[in-house]
């Protein structure tokens, strides 16, 4: 098999994880401590969430209209800036939390909290310092963290 054929097959492979589609902008990206990857991309009217192992088909892929997401921003979260992107999939709610240091924007912490009724909360921890969060790309409903828990 020649190089062109391999490249074509890779392009045609079913939805390999991690690459915003043409016309989308990266909002959030992080490798997890379990060797997987989380990515959130902003399309013109929707936000797309993808989770799975790099180079393999996504284990989970959600696409919801911008209005289904809430972006919370807070200055002065400890010694940094905090951002949460909150959304639901059925009865399950997801919160992507990101905090960056005021003095060093490469010093970041992030995780994803998953809440399901009747189950213990699950957490996906991102690798420290390897997280990207680009708030200016978000078209979700915006609010301050001080406003309390969002009501869906």
Task: List the predicted regions and their residue ranges.
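N-terminal signal peptide c-region/cleavage motif recognized by signal peptidases
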Residues: 14-16
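Cysteine-centric segments in proteins
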Residues: 19-152
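Short, linear, compositionally biased motifs with a strong N-terminal bias
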Residues: 10-12
